[in-house]
Curated annotation (Swiss-Prot):
InterPro entries: At1g76660-like
Record-given protein name: Uncharacterized protein At1g76660
Organism: Arabidopsis thaliana
Annotated Polar residues bias: 42-55
Domain of life: Eukaryota
Bias kind Basic and acidic residues: ranges: 412-425
Disulfide links within the chain: none
Spans annotated as Disordered: 31-55, 257-291, 365-431
Coiled-coil portions: none
Length: 431
């Protein structure tokens, strides 16, 4: 026995160096004040004590206030109050012995405003004392909802974008419905814009019909009475002679005169194909004179003068104004030769031109000079006659303008280069 006690003492001395092997003899530990009741030692310190159904003993003989062992976290820690477990419990009395040996569990309580006040974790109670008044604005009446954007059933885009087949078969009916439903605001910048297919309430334009525009009804599309008021008729098409030219030039002086040049493709612009694909039929049924008139109407709707139009089989880009040769793509349509009419020089308009000078301004795009030069010469004479009639007709329309003709920088540069080239050719001829 003695040897065993000595052996234990030796092991205890060796292991006593480490604090974890030292005997714990009622040492006092610093714990948070919210965990320690302010009444001193209570019966809850007993590990397996019996449950108590009354108020816990709040006094301990000779005990000191344990809340002073730790620095107070708030001034309220100095005051003695009732046990936290009994003040905030649902039944007003709760024994600490019913909890774990270490005291009440921390997950059951939430720390209150002060360190010694704990509150039970419970769903929030909404009352007039705990909830703040709402800061939301007054709910608008349902009458004001009509002033905002329309709801989804009222938007025609779902019907407008149903399928591509519907758009092809119905022509431009959906566009007219969309234009009528969503009209432009009066003050918006885009409300002043007009196009040949627009159908606004005050511009007097009609939607294009699928029918072919004939020569007889083309001039009567907009009937002008003695008072000068335009009366739109039912028959109209995208391009009709003297229709949009008279409307834009006589009744809309606000259209700016930019004086630029427009290169128009006869295959795509002059012959619009509708949804039924009868563009080739319309192309075959039209005479050259009617083509030039429709081209002039198309040109006049965009504010170009008669000598500022270039008609090509394709869109031609002029890179050098001093170069007399023009290049185009290898593609050419099969319905005859396409001629490029070079515009007349403003400096030499007063001097009369001979037939040779007019013929020298026509460039053949199709093929080099061949044996059918007589036919080409006949065709050129006919085109020049049509152009002269066209210029005489448009001159009366242009006489009603109250503003002068302006030219862009590119136009001035092109005319300067052309005049230099023609003067050089004249010097070579004289030499």
């Amino acid at each position: 026995m003695g040897s065993e006690q000595d052996q234990r003492k030796r092991w205890g001395g060796c292991l006593g160096v480490f604090s974890c092997f030292k005997s714990q003899k009622g040492g006092k530990r610093i714990v948070p004040a919210s965990r320690i009741p302010e009444g001193g030692n209570v019966s809850a310190s007993q590990p397996n004590g019996a449950h108590q159904a009354g108020v816990l003993n709040n006094q301990a003989a000779g005990g000191i206030n344990l809340s002073l062992l730790a620095p107070p976290s708030s001034p309220a820690s100095f005051t003695n109050s009732a046990l936290p477990s009994t003040t905030q419990s649902p039944n007003c009395y709760l024994s600490l012995a019913a909890n774990s040996p270490g005291g009440p569990s921390s997950s059951m309580y939430a720390t209150g405003p002060y360190a010694h006040e704990t509150q039970l974790v419970s769903p929030p109670v909404f009352s007039t004392f705990t909830t703040e008044p709402s800061t939301a604005p007054f709910t608008p009446p349902p009458e004001l909802a009509r002033l905002t954007a329309p709801s989804s059933p009222d938007v025609p885009y779902a019907r407008f974008l149903t399928s591509s087949m519907d758009l092809k078969n119905s022509g431009k009916g959906h566009y007219n419905d969309l234009q009528a439903t969503y009209s432009l605001y009066p003050g918006s910048p885009a409300s002043a814009l007009r196009s040949p297919i627009s159908r606004a309430s005050g511009d007097g334009l009609l939607s294009p019909q699928n029918g072919k525009c004939s020569r007889s009804d083309s001039g009567n599309t907009f009937g002008y009475d003695t008072n000068g008021v335009s009366t739109p008729l039912q028959e109209s098409n995208f391009f009709c002679p003297e229709t949009f030219a008279k409307f834009y030039l006589d009744h809309d002086p606000s259209v700016p005169q930019n004086g630029g040049r427009l290169s128009v493709s006869k295959d795509s612009d002059v012959y619009p194909t509708n949804g039924y694909g009868n563009g080739n039929q319309n192309r075959q049924n039209r005479s050259p004179k009617q083509d030039m008139e429709e081209l002039e109407a198309y040109r006049a709707s965009f504010g170009f003068s008669a000598d500022e139009i270039i008609t090509t089989s394709q869109y031609v880009e002029i890179t050098d104004v001093m170069d007399g040769s023009f290049n185009t793509s290898a593609y050419s349509p099969s319905d005859g030769q396409k001629l490029l009419r070079r515009e007349a020089n403003l400096l030499s308009q007063t001097s009369p031109k001979s037939e040779a000078d007019l013929d020298s301004q026509v460039v053949d795009f199709q093929s080099p000079k061949s044996s059918n030069s007589y036919k080409d010469h006949k065709q050129r004479n006919r085109i020049h006659a049509d152009e002269e009639a066209l210029l005489s007709r448009v001159g009366s329309v242009k006489g009603s303008r109250s503003y002068h003709i302006s030219s862009s920088d590119a136009e001035v540069e092109y005319r300067r280069g052309r005049s230099l080239r023609e003067s050089r050719e004249n010097r070579h001829r004289k030499a």
